[in-house]
């Protein structure tokens, strides 16, 4: 296997890679994890609904990543490419993990996988550039809204209490 093919595979499986890593990273932050999983499902539903409404075709090439001499066979709603689900998922995961963890190294890794994924979708003619950009914008927007929701729910549970001076009675 050559290095370029491995990069292509990273791009193809980018959403899955980031999803699994995010589950691991958010395991100790259950509330953020729950919101992330729920928002991932919502992200997929939004993607399918928009593809059904917009009905914009994919490029004609649409190469199969596992056999470059063959055109990828698509059925049903998978024939439509607007917005790109891959870019929607990877940017969603990248923005969400950045907002929750605020860790530069993790964010850079996520951004790299996201860029590889978006490039791979265009390289293999699975999507037009516009479809990838719209998917990324949708994913980023949903990540931001999900983070605001999760953060509000967590902060809403913090209630300041008057000190009961329990230690003074001992």
Regions found by a protein language model. Give the residues of each.
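C-terminal membrane module of polytopic membrane proteins
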Residues: 141-170
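Alpha-helical transmembrane segments that form the membrane-embedded catalytic/substrate-binding core
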Residues: 86-90, 127-151
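A cytosolic-side transmembrane-helix exit/cap motif
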Residues: 52-63, 127-135, 152-160
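Hydrophobic alpha-helical bundle signature of multipass membrane enzymes
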Residues: 1-82, 88-123
């Amino acid at each position: 296997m050559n290095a370029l093919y491995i990069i292509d595979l990273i791009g193809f499986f980018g959403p899955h890679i980031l999803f699994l890593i995010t589950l691991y990273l958010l395991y100790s932050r259950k509330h953020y994890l729950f919101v992330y999983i729920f928002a991932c499902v919502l992200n997929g539903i939004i993607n399918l609904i928009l593809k059904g409404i917009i009905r914009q075709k994919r490029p004609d090439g649409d190469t199969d990543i596992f056999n470059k001499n063959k055109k990828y066979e698509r059925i049903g709603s998978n024939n439509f490419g607007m917005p790109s689900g891959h870019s929607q998922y990877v940017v969603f995961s990248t923005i969400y993990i950045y907002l929750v963890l605020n860790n530069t190294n993790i964010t850079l890794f996520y951004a790299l996988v996201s860029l590889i994924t978006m490039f791979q979708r265009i390289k293999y003619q699975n999507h037009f550039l516009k479809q990838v950009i719209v998917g990324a914008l949708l994913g980023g927007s949903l990540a931001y809204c999900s983070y605001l929701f999760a953060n509000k729910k967590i902060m809403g549970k913090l209630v300041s209490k008057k000190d009961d001076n329990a230690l003074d009675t001992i």
